[in-house]
Each structure stands twice: as structure tokens, then as C-alpha cells.
């Protein structure tokens, strides 16, 4: 690599880091390499090229143009190649050959039911979903050869449906003739019942057992003893696909071993491949998700607003998406272009039906009243000393700051001696649990609240 090429690539990395979320930078950019620049074209190597190329084309084209003009005073375009061309070509050739063999059969085309907006490129990755993302990409790259079935489980609103659709969309991009179907378990049940009534079970079997990729969402819906032959039909469908090395991906709200009403033979098969868990996103991932989601809205979201929202919704992505819709309504009503913390807080209050907050309570006032009650100073509450009485006062003050103000977790942490948001969240959860079990502490906190109000 020449000196100017190195300068160009360093500038591409620098601009990328400043313009996309940290999780996206780590996943899509960090492993990329500049191979050469030839005829004003930057040759960039990527792993998982079919998925990552799309992200680069959609998000980083302007970065390459900017770096090109800065370093070479010329318009530089990009050509993306796999960092393991031989492996990619062999894998794709084998998959294409296999798919062509299947598609020589006189099987009717089907609607995949996929939502094209869900891709790997716009899925925000964090520690809580990293294994699920990696496994999903591996399955999409080589359907039927690894992790079959792939079983993704976790609570609602954590991205399971997004990953199912991303897998299906990538497989269809790689091979448009592949027979891919996304369906919820509930709709599978409905189709089964409908075909029973119409005496057309052969049509159902043809539809499901000739797929290349079956994506079943919320498989726990199948775990009902009252459904008669539904589990039997799904068992036979599973066996037919698995025997022919066709990929199956399932999602559930619980571990396969906890699907108590499913037949044991089905549960056993769900564990043949790879069960992976997705847990609620941490604060940093929620910030990254919001940074990604707000691109869909025509407003300016300052960083403190993003952090405030990330602190308010800590269970799942669906809540964050719902909050953004509420904020959009409030912003339109106010003709606002910038979403301040006040606008966000008003929208959240409306969403939660909490009504207006009459008084804005300073965190310092909470610290003063808590300190007076427990006989410690505000300085001690903010410091690092960890005697039992000071720790309790500090955690109660953090709890009340979270309960009685609209401040984000990072803002509260800053007011307590620059503590991390996770420390505030730990204190809040600890006191919340203690209040539920300790009537004396509950009375103490109500007494302090009355002094603050």
C-alpha cells in the first residue's frame, strides 16, 4: 500500500467512526481492508461480503468520496471483494447447484412473507445478541450446512423477527430462486386447520416440505396440547426438510427445554443445531439502536436526548420504537425541529399516561433531603466512601433521582460524582427490590419524598 493509499484508508476509517454507531463500526468496518486503488477505484476486502457490501454501499459511499477528494483530489469509487474469494465462490457454486436441482421440480412459486426492510445491515449488534447475529449470518451464508436448526430465543421486542427476516432476505439475494418462507407458528396452525377443513392436506405438504428455508416465528404457540395433529404435521415437515439438508430457523420466547407442552421428540430436534439466547440491550446498545432508528425521522436528536431515552426504556427495542412514534406526534404538534429532553419527556408521560410533572426537582435537592434524613452530607453522598450508612443514603438518592426526575441515567451518574450509568441502574434496582420487601424502608422513602415535593 502506498503512502497516499494509507492516508486515504485512515481517513475512511476516521470518517466512518464519526458517522455510524460504534456497534456498526465494529461489525461492518473494523475487519475491512483496502487492497489497492487502481484507476480511481478503491478495492476493499470484506468478510460476509453479500451482507456487508450492502451496508457499505448504503451508508459509506459519501465517506469514500470525501476521503478521495481530500487525499487525491479525485472522485474515488469502490469495488468490494471477498477476503476469501475461493471459499466464497466454492460455497456459492455448491449452494447454487443444490438450489438448481431442487428448482427443476414442478413446484409452484410461493410468497416468502419477508419484510425487506429487515436486514443484517440495519440490525444493531451488542454483547447481548452477538452470538445470535453471528449464527444467523453463518446460516444465511450456507443454508442447511451449519446450525440446523438455528433456535433463537429471548423476550419480546429484542430482534428475533428482524433476524429471521434478515436471514431470508440475504438467502434470496444470493439465490433469487430459493424457496423461502417466513411464517408465525400461529399462522402455521391456522393453515393446518384450514387445509384439514378443505380436505387439502397434500397442498399443505407440498408447500412446506419443498422449501429451501423455513423461518418459523414464536414456535411456543405450537406448544398447546389442544391442537391435535398440528404438532404431528410440523414434526413430519421438520423431518422432511432436515433430511434433505434444508435450513430451518425457529424463534421462541423461551429455551427449547422450557417448551413443556411440546412433544419431547420436537424439543429434542430443536436442540440438534444451535440454541442461542438474546437478552435485553444494555445502555450502550440502546443508544446505538436509537442512533440508528432516529435516521427514519426528520428531526435533530441531541446526544443528551438520545441518552435520556435510552435510560427510560431498558427492556426491549419495541418500546424504544413506540416512544419515537409518540415523540414524532408531539414534535409535529409543537412544530419542533429539534427533539429536546423536555419534548421527549412530555411524549413519554403521554405514552405512560403519567400526566404532567408540575415541578422540576433538582437532583441536588434530593441529595440534600436524603442527606438530612440519614445524617450524611451531600459531599459524602457524591464521594467514594463506602460505609454502610453512606452507601444506603447514596443509593436511596439515586433511586429518588430516577423516580422523581426526567434525567437520564448518565446525567444522574454525573451528579453523583461522575459515576457510570450502570452504577445508577444497579442502585435503583436494589432499592426498588428492597422497598418491595422492607416496609420500614418504604416509609422512610415516602417521608423523604414528602420533604422534597
Swiss-Prot record:
GO terms for cellular component: cytoplasm; plasma membrane. Transmembrane segments: none annotated. Gene3D superfamilies: 1.10.1750.10, 1.10.8.60, P-loop containing nucleotide triphosphate hydrolases (3.40.50.300). ATP binds at residues 157, 159-161. Residues 1-78 are annotated as: Domain I, interacts with DnaA modulators. Keywords: ATP-binding, Cytoplasm, DNA replication, DNA-binding, Lipid-binding, Nucleotide-binding. SUPFAM superfamilies: P-loop containing nucleoside triphosphate hydrolases, TrpR-like. Residues 332-453 are annotated as: Domain IV, binds dsDNA. GO terms for molecular function: ATP binding; ATP hydrolysis activity; DNA replication origin binding; lipid binding. Its main location: cytoplasm. It comes from the Bacteria. InterPro entries: AAA+_ATPase (IPR003593), Chromosome_initiator_DnaA (IPR001957), Chromosome_initiator_DnaA-like (IPR020591), Chromosome_initiator_DnaA_CS (IPR018312), DnaA_C (IPR013159), DnaA_dom (IPR013317), P-loop_NTPase (IPR027417), Trp_repressor/repl_initiator (IPR010921). One of its GO terms (biological process) is regulation of DNA replication. Domain I is involved in oligomerization and binding regulators, domain II is flexibile and of varying length in different bacteria, domain III forms the AAA+ region, while domain IV binds dsDNA. Oligomerizes as a right-handed, spiral filament on DNA at oriC. Belongs to the DnaA family. This is Chromosomal replication initiator protein DnaA. It comes from Streptococcus agalactiae serotype V (strain ATCC BAA-611 / 2603 V/R).
Amino acid at each position: 500500500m502506498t503512502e497516499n493509499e494509507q492516508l486515504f484508508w485512515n481517513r475512511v476509517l476516521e470518517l466512518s467512526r464519526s458517522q455510524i454507531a460504534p456497534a456498526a463500526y465494529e461489525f461492518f468496518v473494523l475487519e475491512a481492508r483496502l487492497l489497492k486503488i487502481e484507476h480511481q477505484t478503491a478495492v476493499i476486502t470484506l468478510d460476509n461480503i453479500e451482507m456487508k457490501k450492502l451496508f457499505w454501499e448504503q451508508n459509506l459511499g459519501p465517506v469514500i468520496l470525501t476521503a478521495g477528494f481530500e487525499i487525491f483530489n479525485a472522485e474515488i469509487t469502490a469495488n468490494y471483494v471477498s477476503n476469501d474469494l475461493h471459499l466464497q465462490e466454492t460455497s456459492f457454486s455448491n449452494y447454487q447447484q443444490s438450489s438448481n436441482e431442487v428448482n427443476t421440480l414442478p413446484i409452484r412459486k410461493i410468497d416468502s412473507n419477508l419484510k425487506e426492510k429487515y436486514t443484517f445491515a440495519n440490525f444493531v449488534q451488542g454483547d447481548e445478541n452477538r452470538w445470535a447475529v453471528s449464527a444467523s449470518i453463518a446460516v444465511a451464508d450456507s443454508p442447511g450446512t451449519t446450525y440446523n436448526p438455528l433456535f433463537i430465543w429471548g423476550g419480546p421486542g429484542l430482534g428475533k423477527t428482524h433476524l429471521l427476516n434478515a436471514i431470508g432476505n440475504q438467502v434470496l439475494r444470493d439465490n433469487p430462486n430459493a424457496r423461502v418462507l417466513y411464517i408465525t407458528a400461529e399462522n402455521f396452525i391456522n393453515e393446518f386447520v384450514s387445509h384439514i377443513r378443505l380436505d387439502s392436506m397434500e397442498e399443505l405438504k407440498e408447500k412446506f416440505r419443498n422449501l429451501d428455508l423455513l423461518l418459523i416465528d414464536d414456535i411456543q404457540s405450537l406448544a398447546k396440547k389442544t391442537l391435535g395433529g398440528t404438532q404431528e404435521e410440523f414434526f413430519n415437515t421438520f423431518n422432511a426438510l432436515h433430511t434433505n439438508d434444508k435450513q430451518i430457523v425457529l424463534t421462541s420466547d423461551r429455551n427449547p427445554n422450557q417448551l413443556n407442552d411440546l412433544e419431547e421428540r420436537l424439543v429434542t430436534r430443536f436442540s440438534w443445531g444451535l440454541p442461542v439466547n438474546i437478552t435485553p440491550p444494555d445502555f450502550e446498545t440502546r443508544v446505538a439502536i436509537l442512533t440508528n432508528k432516529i435516521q427514519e425521522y426528520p428531526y435533530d436528536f441531541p446526544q443528551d436526548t438520545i441518552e435520556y431515552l435510552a435510560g427510560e426504556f431498558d427492556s426491549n427495542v419495541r418500546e424504544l420504537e413506540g416512544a419515537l412514534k409518540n415523540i414524532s406526534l408531539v414534535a409535529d404538534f409543537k412544530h419542533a425541529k429539534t427533539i429536546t429532553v423536555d419534548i421527549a419527556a412530555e411524549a413519554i408521560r403521554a405514552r405512560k399516561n403519567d400526566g404532567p410533572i408540575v415541578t422540576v426537582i433538582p437532583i441536588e435537592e434530593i441529595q440534600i433531603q436524603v442527606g438530612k434524613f440519614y445524617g450524611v452530607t451531600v459531599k459524602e453522598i457524591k464521594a467514594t466512601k463506602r460505609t454502610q450508612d453512606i452507601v444506603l443514603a447514596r443509593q436511596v438518592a439515586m433511586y429518588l433521582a430516577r423516580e422523581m426526575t426526567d434525567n437520564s441515567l448518565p446525567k444522574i451518574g454525573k451528579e453523583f460524582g461522575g459515576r457510570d450509568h450502570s452504577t445508577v441502574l444497579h442502585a435503583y434496582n436494589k432499592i426498588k427490590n428492597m422497598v418491595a420487601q422492607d416496609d420500614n424502608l418504604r416509609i422512610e422513602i415516602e417521608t423523604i419524598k414528602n420533604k422534597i415535593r
